[in-house]
Amino acid sequence: MHFLVNGEGKYELHLTMRTWKSEKIPVKSLAGTLSNLTGRRLIPGKEGAQLIGTDYTTVVFREGPSYYTMSGIARIGKGCSNISGDSFTMMDLPGGKRGVALSDGMGCGQAACRESTLVIELLEELLEAGFPEKTAIQMINTTLVCGREEIHYSTIDLTVFDLYTGECELIKAGASSTFIRRKDQIEHLTSTSLPIGVMNSLEIDSVKRQLTDGTYVIMLTDGVLDALPVGEQDFLLETIIKGTEIRNPKELARHIL
């Protein structure tokens, strides 16, 4: 048995074992016992054996995340159109992180949809390739500014959840407000940065927050706030979020929309 810390700073347990006689034991059933013994949530590696038999087998157990996310989405185009100029993605990132991104394309309809879809696809490719979040956004901005004669801007609203620590980072380029609901408290986070595709030099707003069990992070695009009376938008949306007892993320998204 070997107990070590891997390159990501997470614990690993390498265990070589076998059973007596013809008995076979599922690897998953051992994970709970080992977690109790070590005081850490250990999960078996996907690449190893799933059953322990009479032959010696080495199984790797890795420290698993302490948190998980549940997501819900609601969308509609301008004027109740079926075509929305907004695009989104949810992706697993290295190091036990989870990313959620929104992009609002310039204008509305098909053209805006194409712009925001392009931005989201580029973001997915760069993040999956291992680029840091802010570097990826800067690279997309350079692509949009230098590759076209006309200005076509899009917003980026990216939230990265660390499923091990419970911390999240909110990264915005021209994006709308984000609301964090903790029990009876609502935190309203805004951005003053420009969208991508406008200028070569891009300032990206970023802030980190510690989350706890049951916290809701509500991301939205400008169209939601624009549908509310000017001057009362933030207050009314906070009231809507705080006043509902809905707990299911998908139902909450529909309720807000």
Stretch-by-stretch model annotation:
Residues 81-97, 156, 188-229:
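Acidic loop->beta-strand submotif enriched in PP2C/PPM serine/threonine phosphatases
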Residues 15, 91, 131:
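N-terminal loops that bind phosphate or other acidic moieties
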Residues 105-129, 211, 215-257:
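Active-site-proximal, acidic helix/loop segment immediately C-terminal to a metal-coordinating Asp/Glu
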Residues 1:
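Conserved catalytic-loop aspartate of Hanks-type protein kinases
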Residues 5-11, 29-52, 56, 64, ...:
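Catalytic core of PPM/PP2C metal-dependent serine/threonine phosphatase domains
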Residues 169-198, 205-207, 213, 234, ...:
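PP2C/PPM-type serine/threonine phosphatase catalytic core
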Residues 50-105, 111:
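N-terminal entry segment of metal-dependent catalytic domains or homologous docking segments
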Residues 15-23:
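A short interface-forming secondary-structure element
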